[in-house]
Amino acid sequence: MKLHLASGNLHKAEEFAVLAAASARDDAPAIEIVSARAMGGMPEVVEDTGTFVGNARKKAAALRVRLPAGSWVLADDSGVCVDALHGGPGVESAYYAGPEASGRANYEKLLRVLADVPDERRGAYFFCLLLVLDGAGAEYVFEGRCQGRLLREPRGSAGFGYDPIFVPDGFDRSYAELGEDVKNRISHRARAWAQLAEWGRRS
């Protein structure tokens, strides 16, 4: 199965490639991830639907029109949902500090907003929604989440986005400190991918 990734985020492309390789089995067809960069780049998409599934659907549709008929597309929309912010920034996580904001700018803004929130109220979870468009245009949706808490300052140099300030439940290190191997076993994206991979083996 070849999935064309509807994302211009190089970090996501690398993460999906690792997840696909890790989920490969001898008794099932391999899943190949083709990055948008390999297809001339990802078209610009305004993520304005207000929902994870709506944004993923827009991204998938934008890339699909550039591909040969019958191509399969994978779109991802994800974010960090903070208890003290009633689930925010959520679907707006990628541009929390502005439309061109970096991952660092986004998490620094979040830390400022939460500056007066005590440790016991800094619960949060990462959420990932994966949407597959098959060759006939049918949609398949997979979801994953990872519960945890937010730090008061960034820790670690690996990962991207909000990784340096998020500590998953059961650990005392941030996503950015845990390293790729651990993160790709427990993350929100890994959990959504596990569902997708299992579906792919059954299809």
Curated annotation (Swiss-Prot):
It comes from the Bacteria. One of its GO terms (cellular component) is cytosol. Mg(2+) binds at residues 47, 77. Binds 1 Mg(2+) ion per subunit. Substrate binds at residues 7-12, 78, 160-163, 183, 188-189. The keyword Nucleotide-binding applies. It catalyses: XTP + H2O = XMP + diphosphate + H(+); dITP + H2O = dIMP + diphosphate + H(+); ITP + H2O = IMP + diphosphate + H(+). The active site is at 77 (proton acceptor). Its EC number is 3.6.1.66. InterPro entries: dITP/XTP_pyrophosphatase, ITPase-like_fam, RdgB/HAM1. Keywords: Hydrolase, Magnesium, Metal-binding, Nucleotide metabolism, Nucleotide-binding. One of its GO terms (biological process) is purine nucleoside triphosphate catabolic process. The keyword Hydrolase applies. One of its GO terms (molecular function) is ITP diphosphatase activity. Its cofactor is Mg(2+). Pyrophosphatase that catalyzes the hydrolysis of nucleoside triphosphates to their monophosphate derivatives, with a high preference for the non-canonical purine nucleotides XTP (xanthosine triphosphate), dITP (deoxyinosine triphosphate) and ITP. Seems to function as a house-cleaning enzyme that removes non-canonical purine nucleotides from the nucleotide pool, thus preventing their incorporation into DNA/RNA and avoiding chromosomal lesions. Belongs to the HAM1 NTPase family. Homodimer. This is dITP/XTP pyrophosphatase. The lineage of its organism: Bacteria, Pseudomonadati, Verrucomicrobiota, Opitutia, Opitutales.
